[in-house]
Swiss-Prot record:
Disruption phenotype: No visible phenotype under normal growth conditions. It holds the Pfam family Ovate. Residues 63-91, 111-131 are annotated as: Disordered. Its main location: nucleus. Expressed in roots, rosette and cauline leaves, shoots, stems, flower buds and siliques. Keywords: Nucleus, Repressor, Transcription, Transcription regulation. The lineage of its organism: Eukaryota, Viridiplantae, Streptophyta, Embryophyta, Tracheophyta. Residues 69-87 have a biased composition (Low complexity). The keyword Repressor applies. It comes from Arabidopsis thaliana (Mouse-ear cress). Plants over-expressing OFP16 show small rosette size, late flowering, reduced fertilization and blunt-end siliques. PROSITE patterns: OVATE. Residues 166-235 form the OVATE domain. This is Transcription repressor OFP16.
Length: 244
C-alpha cells in the first residue's frame, strides 16, 4: 500500500512542475551505472519537484540564473553595484556643480553681518534721519536768542544785614520777569522799613535799583531792564502810595 501511494504522489502536483529548475535532469544512463532503473527508488524529477515546494532557492542562491521564455538575463553583484554607483554619481554631480557655479556659499569680501543675504538698511537710514533732524533742531535752538536774566533778590542798601544774590534764569519773556523782580524788590524794601516815603530817598533807591540791574545783566538785556523800570515807575506814580 505505501508503495502505491508513493508512486501516485506525483499525480497530485501540476504538470508544469515536471521541468527541472535547480539542476539539469539526469538521464537514466547516468542515474544508474548499469542502466537499470530500480523500481523502489523515486525518480530524480519527482525529488526535485518536491524540493521546490518546501525550499526557497532564492534565499540560498540570490543570483541564480532563471530562464525566461523571451530572453535570458544575467545579473552579477559587481555589475549591480557599479550601475548603482554610476547612477548615484550622475544624480549628484549636476547639483554639486550647480551649487558651486552659483557661488551661493562663497563671499568675495566680509560684510557687516553673518547672514547669507545682505540685510536691508531701513533702520540705519531712519537713525541717520533722526540724527539730522535732532542736529537741525539743536542748531535752531542755539540760533534762537535766549536771554540770561540776572535778578537781584536783595541788596545791602535795601535790607540791612543781607547780601546780594545773583540768580540766573533763562526766560522766554525777559520783560515780564524784570518787571516782577523790580516790583518784589520795592515791596520788600517798603515792608522792611528800609524805604521811606521821602521823595529824595525814593529817587536814590530807584536810581540804585536801575544801576544794579544794568550792571548785573548783559548788554543785550538792557533794553528789557529799561522798559521794565519804566513800567514800574509809571505804576508807582499812578498809585496812591507815592515814594517820589
Amino acid at each position: 500500500m505505501p508503495k502505491i501511494l508513493w508512486k501516485s504522489l506525483h499525480l497530485c502536483f501540476p504538470s508544469n512542475l515536471t521541468k527541472c529548475y535547480s539542476s539539469p535532469c539526469i538521464p537514466p544512463s547516468s542515474a544508474d551505472p548499469d542502466g537499470i532503473i530500480q523500481p523502489n527508488r523515486p525518480s530524480i524529477v519527482l525529488l526535485n519537484n518536491f524540493n521546490l515546494l518546501y525550499h526557497n532557492d532564492n534565499h540560498h542562491h540570490p543570483h541564480r540564473v532563471i530562464d525566461l521564455p523571451s530572453s535570458s538575463t544575467t545579473t552579477t553583484p559587481a555589475a549591480t553595484s557599479s550601475s548603482s554607483t554610476s547612477s548615484y554619481e550622475s544624480d549628484i554631480s549636476p547639483d554639486v556643480s550647480a551649487a558651486f557655479a552659483s557661488r551661493r556659499f562663497f563671499f568675495s569680501s566680509p560684510g557687516r553681518s553673518n547672514a547669507i543675504t545682505d540685510s536691508p538698511e531701513p533702520r540705519s537710514r531712519e537713525f541717520s534721519d533722526n540724527y539730522d533732524d535732532a542736529t537741525i533742531t539743536s542748531t535752531k535752538k542755539k540760533k534762537k536768542k535766549v536771554y540770561d536774566n540776572s535778578v537781584t533778590t536783595t541788596t545791602t542798601r535795601l535790607i540791612s544785614g543781607g547780601t546780594a544774590v545773583t540768580q540766573h534764569v533763562d526766560s522766554p519773556d525777559p520783560l515780564t520777569d524784570f518787571r516782577r523782580s523790580m516790583q518784589e524788590m520795592i515791596d520788600a524794601a517798603i515792608d522792611a522799613g528800609e524805604l521811606s516815603r521821602d521823595p529824595n530817598d525814593g529817587y536814590d533807591f530807584l536810581d540804585e535799583l536801575l544801576l544794579t540791574y544794568l550792571s548785573l545783566n548783559p548788554a543785550d538785556t538792557h533794553k528789557f531792564v529799561i522798559r521794565a523800570f519804566s513800567d514800574i515807575l509809571v505804576s508807582l506814580l499812578s498809585e496812591e502810595r507815592r515814594i517820589c
